[in-house]
Amino acid sequence: MGDNKGRSTPRVVCCAIPIWRPAGKVLLVTSRKRKDIWVLPKGGWEPSDGVLEAAASREALEEAGVRGTITRFVTTIPSASSTYHFYELDVADLEPDWLESKERKREWVDYAEALKRIGWKSELAQALALSSIAPKR
């Protein structure tokens, strides 16, 4: 049996990979729980979201203050407690003040730096490696 943290089924988590294509950068945010670690904007799907893409877009706005267009489904990665769904978000607008701006920092970084910073969380690193911003093999 997996660790579902008291849930009967794994939590559905929707993640955005915010990309600024002209610069080839990805936007990371700090965790609210641990200010020294970096993550991709992500959070639980809510029934009011409707589709998973809407949840990923909402989380990007709440956690990172970015608006844009979901352009690509990247992957789904199951873990013991959650099922992660990753989407690329082409950023169109960066809000100067956003819902979690007092709780998080955000920073544009290149692919290699992003991979280094989120490598502690295998699901995030795997998804970034499958994104269109990853170097072609």
Regions found by a protein language model. Give the residues of each.
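A residue-level structural signature of the nucleotidyltransferase/glycosyltransferase Rossmann-like core
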Residues: 9-11, 37, 106-107
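A short coil-to-beta-strand element that immediately follows conserved catalytic motifs
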Residues: 65-77
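Active-site-adjacent beta-strand/loop module that shapes the phosphate/pyrophosphate-binding cleft
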Residues: 75-113, 124, 128-134
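Eukaryotic N-terminal low-complexity, Ser/Thr- and Lys/Arg-rich leader segments
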Residues: 1, 135-137
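Conserved N-terminal beta-strand and adjoining loop/helix that marks the start
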Residues: 1-26
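Conserved Nudix-box catalytic region and its N-terminal flanking loop in Nudix hydrolases
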Residues: 22-66
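Short, well-ordered beta-strand micro-motif
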Residues: 18, 30, 86-90
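Sequence-level preference for short, compositionally simple segments enriched
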Residues: 16, 120-126
